């Protein structure tokens, strides 16, 4: 049986990996997952990521901790296969009053809510991270 929501699975693996104090988590790779991992690394929520394998590529995400506690406090799926959530530039949410980020899929690629606002672009709200 196929996976219904691979992005939710990715976020759950990150959440569970940090709850279990794992160094890294791995999952099947896709272009969207790699783009989300890139944004998480740029924002400082993960240490790094790598893609290995040709036939079935695996994405490995290195989790980040600060003084023994996970850096990611909140990672929550917003838009899902059964209910897509799209917002225009003026309606993009601020996560935790601007302390967190909303990851947005736009026509120019996957970016944070701040970058989307700066570029005057709306799009699909993939998830919240704080």
Swiss-Prot record:
Molecular function in Gene Ontology: rRNA binding; structural constituent of ribosome
Top-level taxon of the source organism: Bacteria
Record's keyword annotation contains GTP-binding: no
InterPro entries: Ribosomal_uS8 (IPR000630), Ribosomal_uS8_CS (IPR047863), Ribosomal_uS8_sf (IPR035987)
A cellular-component GO term for this protein: ribosome
Keywords attached to this entry: Ribonucleoprotein, Ribosomal protein, RNA-binding, rRNA-binding
Pfam family, one: Ribosomal_S8
Any GO BP: translation
UniProt-listed Gene3D superfamilies: 3.30.1370.30, 3.30.1490.10
UniProt cross-references to SUPFAM superfamilies, sorted A to Z: Ribosomal protein S8
Main function: One of the primary rRNA binding proteins, it binds directly to 16S rRNA central domain where it helps coordinate assembly of the platform of the 30S subunit.
Family: Belongs to the universal ribosomal protein uS8 family.
Quaternary structure note: Part of the 30S ribosomal subunit. Contacts proteins S5 and S12.
Name recorded for this polypeptide: Small ribosomal subunit protein uS8
Native organism: Aeromonas hydrophila subsp. hydrophila (strain ATCC 7966 / DSM 30187 / BCRC 13018 / CCUG 14551 / JCM 1027 / KCTC 2358 / NCIMB 9240 / NCTC 8049)
Lineage: Bacteria, Pseudomonadati, Pseudomonadota, Gammaproteobacteria, Aeromonadales
GN (gene name): rpsH
